[in-house]
Amino acid sequence: MSDKPIDIQYDKQATPNLSGVITPPTNETGNDSVREKLSKLVGDAMSNNPYFAAGGGLMILGTGLAVARSGIIKASRVLYRQMIVDLEIQSKDKSYAWFLTWMAKHPQRVSRHLSVRTNYIQHDNGSVSTKFSLVPGPGNHWIRYKGAFILIKRERSAKMIDIANGSPFETVTLTTLYRDKHLFDDILNEAKDIALKTTEGKTVIYTSFGPEWRKFGQPKAKRMLPSVILDSGIKEGILDDVYDFMKNGKWYSDRGIPYRRGYLLYGPPGSGKTSFIQALAGELDYNICILNLSENNLTDDRLNHLMNNMPERSILLLEDIDAAFNKRSQTGEQGFHSSVTFSGLLNALDGVTSSEETITFMTTNHPEKLDAAIMRPGRIDYKVFVGNATPYQVEKMFMKFYPGETDICKKFVNSVKELDITVSTAQLQGLFVMNKDAPHDALKMVSSLRNANHIF
């Protein structure tokens, strides 16, 4: 065997013949084939099955409608906010009753559900008549006001109750175009004017009811100040002091002094204390808030709340202030439930919760029974004695009832002096009322004044 190496030559460009080699199939070709078959099968099913096609169409249609509905709702809300305006009036607001009265008088309203309001009207001669007003009840109502349509919706809550009067809370909502929102002011001003006309020239008396002030009876005709005859200088002195107080609010504020003024009228019963306060309220065009400290279930907290939430332009009247706490202690065992303390009254008069710009009048027949704490300045700033009739008052009262009867007046005054007794102005008025147009008969009956309990 030769050791000479064998030299093998090959062509680098030659391609090997692999025809005899078996190559395994790849997966890609098979997967593509399966997908094509499934796609064809599903496509045929969707195109050939009418139920499937209809369901898909409905789904697409429903989705489109839902999107459209959502868009419409959002667009309508935006449009509502831009074009519509609402005004809500709650039943606890003063304007609520005013608005219902205005609605009752409005001629151009469309209402199918009505409620009735009953009003008592007291005439100057003392007679009382009844007037019924039909107002819109709960529900929707349309009115046309100054060319604009207004929707009025009155709602009554079934779950919320006003504990003060036991009635459900109510709201009235007025809806109109935004461009007409100025009509709300016009409506409220008209309603206010109608309400104020019922009290024009009259004095409104308020009394406490639960935690709030309520009108007591019908507004009373104003009593003229000249109709109350006190001793010389008393009436004028109080009136000057009140006017001075009312015009110096800034002076009080600049000096950090509470803007309050307290008056005490003391003297025997029937001397004209309460009558003067009524006449003063008429002179000032003020109302009167009467607070009975002996009221059942009155507490210190309620007292503070009432005195801090008085109606505007009102005089606070505390009558028989000396008897309030005595009565409570004397009748406590018999079921009297007032729990106002003396310190509670003092805090209500001058505490941090007391109202500013307050005129308070207190009356008493026994000033000696009052505690010194209540007599201090800041609680009582002006004290005046209102006593029985003096010769000055007897003369003035006689001439008021019998103008021009000067000679008989002198005889009457002298006859009263000769009785050597104290006579109240209430007794004199009773005598004069009994003899309205008969001054001579009044003179003859002077002796009846000896009996203070005489009924004319």
Curated annotation (Swiss-Prot):
It is found in: Mitochondrion inner membrane. Changing K273A: Abolished ATPase activity; impaired assembly of the mitochondrial respiratory chain complex III. It comes from the Eukaryota. ATP binds at G267, P268, P269, G270, S271, G272, K273, T274. A motif (Mitochondrial-targeting signal) lies at residues 69-83. It is an enzyme of class 3 (hydrolase). Residues 1-44 are mitochondrial intermembrane. One of its GO terms (molecular function) is protein transmembrane transporter activity. It catalyses: ATP + H2O = ADP + phosphate + H(+). Residues 69-456 are mitochondrial matrix. Its EC number is 3.6.1.-. One of its GO terms (cellular component) is mitochondrial intermembrane space. One of its GO terms (biological process) is chaperone-mediated protein complex assembly. PROSITE patterns: AAA. The keyword Flavoprotein does not apply. The chain crosses the membrane at residues 45-68. It is a single-pass membrane protein. Present with 1990 molecules/cell in log phase SD medium. Chaperone necessary for the incorporation of Rieske iron-sulfur protein RIP1 into the mitochondrial respiratory chain complex III. Belongs to the AAA ATPase family. BCS1 subfamily. This is Mitochondrial chaperone BCS1.
